[in-house]
Swiss-Prot record:
SMART domains: acidPPc. The chain crosses the membrane at residues 24-44, 53-73, 119-139, 140-160. It is a multi-pass membrane protein. It catalyses: di-trans,octa-cis-undecaprenyl diphosphate + H2O = di-trans,octa-cis-undecaprenyl phosphate + phosphate + H(+). This is Undecaprenyl-diphosphatase BcrC. Induction: Expression is sigma M, sigma X and sigma I-dependent. Induced by vancomycin and bacitracin, via sigma M. Expression is maximal during early exponential phase and decreases during stationary phase. InterPro entries: P_Acid_Pase_2/haloperoxi_sf, P_Acid_Pase_2/haloperoxidase, UPP_Pase. It is found in: Cell membrane. Catalyzes the dephosphorylation of undecaprenyl diphosphate (UPP). Confers resistance to bacitracin. Belongs to the BcrC/YbjG family. Keywords: Antibiotic resistance, Cell membrane, Cell shape, Cell wall biogenesis/degradation, Hydrolase, Membrane, Peptidoglycan synthesis, Transmembrane, Transmembrane helix. The keyword S-adenosyl-L-methionine does not apply. One of its GO terms (molecular function) is undecaprenyl-diphosphatase activity.
Amino acid sequence: MNYEIFKAIHGLSHHNSVLDSIMVFITEYAIVAYALILLAIWLFGNTQSRKHVLYAGITGIAGLVINYLITLVYFEPRPFVAHTVHTLIPHAADASFPSDHTTGALAISIAMLFRNRKIGWPLVIFGLLTGFSRIWVGHHYPVDVLGSLVVAIIIGFLFFRFSDLLRPFVDLVVRIYEAIINKLTKKPTDQNF
């Protein structure tokens, strides 16, 4: 059934160059988009927003670590290795399950959703689209994306639930950053001589 759903989704590719280009763009640049979004929130947000960015980034990294650990005990070949699949773009023949792109995107998104729904929901939708694009281009099975969603939800929940353990580190990083920025942007005082 996993392969049948994969064929149904991937079978939509190679018919419309505009849709293919959109899916390739998403699959190749989603992680860059997430990095830029988090950077913008960090640079233009307030203290609380910066803390949210750190929690989201740490959660994303933790999700990728979990993915790596999964690949040490379970290896699923990619669809284009196990079957005749014409991918839209090339990819290494490494482990298919779970999808790193999708896990990273959704772990960041879910972490942000727990802290700021207004920003979190669009990120979750984009994360799901990222997972869909991975199937569309022929790099992952649907179960790979579903596995990524499960990893992201579990990691996102755990890191939110136990965020007090990270709070001293997060607070310290934000305080140091804001102290540096305040020092750099402080206007010199006029002195009468």
